[in-house]
Regions:
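Positively charged n-region of N-terminal signal peptides that target proteins for export
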Residues: 1-6
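Scaffold/interface architecture of coatomer-like assemblies
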Residues: 25-314
Length: 314
């Protein structure tokens, strides 16, 4: 019995050593392939104290495969303004409750770093009326803000307008981000768990690397006071923001008393962004691939787009 027990012990020890080698093999990551860039926002899981994240703290997964992180550039300090183009996108179907928030938006624009380029556009008839192209003259951007038309027919689907802006926005090396102010209601599609126009806007934004924050602001007409449509509108805004790596702001079905808390939170998030570069695992065809980010740094969460565009392998 003693010899049999000894033999089992040796076999168990050898098995344990073999199993312990598996994680080490799993940690091997590919060192060749297309390099993908994506903006990441670091937020605190609890409280407001956001930890500093270094490159070695970041882990990227495509499915079950771990990708190699090759770059992690803090977009603060010298890189903060130079790396940011910010478009305010306002729904022309918004009701007059938005009128009292224009001053909040003006002060938000004025508070941006001097090198941040700000643009202003209004969503109408499925396109964007750009009243101010991207400019670092923030006083000029302030002046371009106007009251929304308050016409339910002016914005059949805000997601048509989002897609239109993405297509017209020249690709640059800068961060490209949108603050969208709308009720989110798709008057063209209606409502339901899967809006193809929201899905298209999400995919186009992810492919272009554009982050879309949103603030719910009630619209006019019957849709503007239909709880069913309002509920779907808020869901669509949340989907658009969440899947592009941003935040959606709303409080119930009514207008907020002030945009200031939302804009302060947005400013805080912009100040804790990083440019992540990693080597992706390509498929046979180019396309969108889902990614997951992880970190073991306490009280830190990494927020980014749910999917990124990965070129085909050679």
């Amino acid at each position: 019995m003693t010899k049999f027990h000894f033999t089992l012990s040796v076999m168990f020890a050898m098995a344990t050593l073999a199993i312990s080698d598996i994680p080490l093999l799993a940690q091997q990551v590919p060192s060749s392939g297309p390099q993908v860039h994506v903006v990441v926002t670091v937020e605190a899981r609890h409280g407001t104290n956001i930890p500093v994240i270094n490159r070695e703290d970041v882990v990227v997964y495509q499915g079950h495969d771990r990708d190699q992180v090759t770059g992690w550039l803090p977009l603060q300090g010298d890189h903060a303004g130079l790396e940011l183009e910010l478009f305010l996108l306002i729904d022309d179907a918004a009701n007059n409750s938005l009128n009292s928030q224009l001053q909040d938006l003006r002060e938000f624009i004025s508070s941006q770093p001097a090198t941040t380029a700000v643009g202003v556009g209004y969503m109408r008839e499925g396109t964007v009326q750009i009243v101010q192209n991207l400019t670092t003259d923030h006083a000029q951007a302030d002046k371009s803000l106007r009251l929304p038309l308050g016409d339910p027919g002016a914005s059949p689907s805000p997601y048509f307008s989002v897609t239109d802006l993405i297509k017209r926005w020249p690709e640059t090396q800068a961060r490209r981000e949108i603050l969208m102010i709308s009720d989110g209601i798709d008057r063209f599609y209606g409502g339901g768990p899967s809006d193809p126009y929201v899905d298209t806007a999400v995919e186009q934004a992810q492919r272009a690397g554009i982050i879309i924050f949103s603030i719910y602001s009630p619209g006019v007409g019957h849709s503007g006071h239909s709880f069913w449509r309002i509920n779907w509108g808020q869901n669509y805004l949340s989907q658009l923001s969440d899947e592009t790596g941003a935040e959606s702001y709303y409080l119930g079905f009514g207008p907020p008393v002030s945009f200031v808390p939302y804009l302060d939170d947005l400013t805080h998030r912009l100040a804790h962004q990083y440019l992540l570069t990693f080597i992706a695992k390509p498929e046979k065809k180019s396309g969108m691939q889902r990614i997951r980010l992880r970190t073991e740094v306490p009280n830190a969460e990494l927020v980014t787009a749910a999917s990124v565009y990965v070129p085909a392998g050679s």
